[in-house]
Design a protein with these regions (language model features):
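Mid/C-terminal beta-alpha module of Rossmann-like enzyme folds, strongest
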Residues: 89-155
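NAD(P)-dependent short-chain dehydrogenase/reductase
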Residues: 39-42, 46-79
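Active-site Tyr-X1-5-Lys
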Residues: 13-42
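Active-site loop of classical SDR/Rossmann-like NAD(P)-dependent oxidoreductases
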Residues: 112, 156-166
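A short acidic, glycine-rich active-site loop
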Residues: 10-18, 72-76
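Active-site "gating" loop of Rossmann-like NAD(P)-dependent oxidoreductase/epimerase domains
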Residues: 1-13, 34, 53, 63-66
Length: 166
């Protein structure tokens, strides 16, 4: 489904804390805009890539792909945007004086398999070739949730499972 700046938030029923808190913050900001308490715009970036983000969540798997040590890929997709493009949009949005607007910062839609294949090709290694079924990913997410509940960390949690299969 193609989304634009007027598209409603449709994943609240999944209980994805990361997405829900970003959405709730945007609602609070736009409520204040509509009450003429502040001037603001919203920038909704897709998955941002650029220098300095190698320790960010999903980057661990991508680094393993680049090293030829990750044979798996999930069934989901991702939209990627470079950090420089997001910064440019922020500057343009600030200068636009269009109070209360929302802007989507995005690039190309790719499957995660396509993303991993591109990473492997650039690194000169074999791309992942084993598709992980959703059931396996969600099972790993539940195990990760359980480990988090006792103060440890699993490979993924339920939020990661959802986002890697969307």
């Amino acid at each position: 489904q193609i989304l634009d700046e007027s598209s409603p938030y449709k994943v609240a029923h999944l209980g994805l804390g990361y997405f829900d808190t970003k959405h709730d913050a945007e609602v609070a900001v736009f409520d204040a805009v509509h009450r003429n308490e502040i001037e603001a715009v919203a920038i909704n970036p897709s998955t941002i890539y650029g220098p300095g983000d190698a320790k960010k969540g999903s980057r661990g798997a991508q680094l393993k792909v680049a090293r030829g040590k990750f044979p798996f890929y999930p069934p989901g997709g991702v939209n990627v945007v470079h950090v420089d493009d997001v910064v440019d949009l922020c500057i343009k949005a600030f200068r636009s004086n269009k109070n209360g607007e929302r802007y989507i910062a995005c690039g190309e839609n790719l499957t995660i398999h396509e993303t991993f294949t591109r990473i492997a090709k650039l690194a000169g290694v074999k791309p992942p070739s084993i598709a992980l079924p959703r059931s396996v990913i969600f099972g790993l997410g539940k195990i990760g949730d359980l480990l988090e509940s006792v103060g440890s960390k699993g490979p993924i949690n339920s939020d990661n499972a959802w986002t890697s299969t969307m």
